[in-house]
Amino acid sequence: SFTTGITELGGTYYNQLWKDSNFVLGEPVSELRYVGRNVDIIMARLVKNETVELFGANTTVPFINGCDSTYHPCQILADALTLLEKFGSLNVKFLYIGAKNNVFNSLVEFFSKMEMGTLYGLTPLVNDTAVDADFYEKAKATGYYVELDPTMSMEEARKYVKDMDVLYTDTWVDMEFFNNPAYAQKKEETLKMMMPYQINKEFLEGSHAIVLHDMPMHVGYEISQDVVDENLEHILDQAENRRHAEKAVMATLLGKGQLL
């Protein structure tokens, strides 16, 4: 979406894999500053948030966090655009069910900072690299994030569903691990634990909420096929909006006219 977006804005992109770059050989900050001599803007998808923070503090050109293991800010900008398109407002009741991961963290940050709407989080599964207990406590103190008991059953959670405008889920197993044989046992354990938390038609009975998923979806696990079928246009709009939101970020950072 970023590469298509910068092309639509009239720019040119260069794709560099970390493993094939001088970042694995040299001193990272020096390499980053050299990259900045050759481009006008950098978007990086990195594993560690610490690396993102290091690069953001030392870059000589605008630097965008495309995704890391702790946060996924650009996804949430796309989600916000989707809410505006569907509801005309960010003042919605929003229930997230799934893993406490980078997408969830950015949702928490968004709702608590925008101070509009209410995010309810039911997160029985925890990705250790994403956890920041102090961050969650500060978000809860704003009143715009409500942390549900992670041991709550889906039957108990149904009492919240009837009042929600949006239900949101994400993959339970990160995409780099889903088909990794070395992770097979852990994957099976995770899926067995989380199957009771699938978003399906039975769970949604009596609900007016739309269902969103940031993709890729593992249909039959976190979300059932019939729920996907009924909400596919919403989910595809959400996915397309990544490109539009990212174009807005890049155009803003570069300044009007620089891409024309």
Show the residue positions of the predicted features.
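Short, charged, surface-exposed secondary-structure boundary motifs
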Residues: 24-25, 72-78, 129-133, 244-248
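Rossmann-like adenosine-cofactor binding region
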Residues: 141-226
